[in-house]
Regions:
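A short acidic, amphipathic alpha-helical/loop segment
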Residues: 8-15, 130-134, 153-161
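Core dinuclear metal-dependent hydrolase active-site scaffold
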Residues: 44-134, 212-220
Length: 220
């Protein structure tokens, strides 16, 4: 529920209504921060499966990236900035507990469509643990946090271990911080996968562009 992920949720709810799916421990603060009616909030708990009209959602525990530890930047309860950092820059009314809650409560999840297409979402530092949860799921598509410290070899390891057909990066906008060329990065990842005879591939999507993902039959 950090501001860079949740800042539009109030606007979207007021435009489309519906239910807001959110980690249960963060539900009250999300409702308060964005003035969303309590009845529209749908608290989620790890280990549960939720059935909707168009898809099934399986929720797993998650853990935020530990970049703050690597860079020596900590959010302590004693620091008054913890109620502002990560929120005020995105137009969220402060003080707010969205920043601290977003660091503590994280989910990974798997979506299965009515056509049995499986999409896995995993972010943060607990990829190895998440693999244990979904080892029998074999998702078609995985959305994986591209943590800036990952080498192409490490990123290739993840798609190979997951067994997915395609991997798309999450939070890859962080490459702007270092001026990194993600197209070149993904090219290296795919070259590594090819060298390992792994059929999985990754792709760097262009921001704000729609794509179709499909299974095709091509004549030789």
């Amino acid at each position: 529920v950090h501001g860079d992920h949740s800042n539009l949720v109030g606007e979207l709810w007021n435009r489309f209504y519906g239910r807001v799916l959110v980690p249960a421990e963060c539900a009250m603060e999300v409702a308060k921060a964005y003035d969303i009616p309590y009845g529209a909030i749908y608290p989620l708990y790890p280990g549960n499966t939720y059935y909707f009209d168009d898809f099934t959602l399986k929720v797993y525990p998650g853990a935020h990236d530990n970049r703050a530890f690597r860079e020596g930047k900590f959010q302590r309860p004693s620091d008054p900035r913890s109620l502002y950092d990560g929120s005020e820059g995105f137009g969220i009314s402060c003080p707010s507990n969205l920043g601290p809650l977003g660091s503590m409560y994280n989910f990974n999840y798997l979506i299965e469509t009515k056509n049995n297409y499986r999409i896995d979402f995993s972010a943060g530092r607990d990829f190895e643990e998440h693999l244990q949860h979904v080892q029998k799921e074999r998702p078609n598509l995985m959305l994986r946090h591209r943590i800036r410290s990952y080498t192409p070899e490490q990123y290739a390891d993840m798609i190979e271990q997951m067994g997915a057909q395609l991997m798309l990066p999450l939070h890859h906008n962080n490459a702007r911080a270092s001026g990194e060329d993600l197209n070149e990065y993904m090219r290296k990842v795919n070259e590594i996968l090819i060298s390992r005879n792994c059929s999985g591939r990754t792709f760097n999507p262009e921001p704000y562009r729609w794509y179709q993902i499909c299974t095709s039959i091509l004549a030789e």
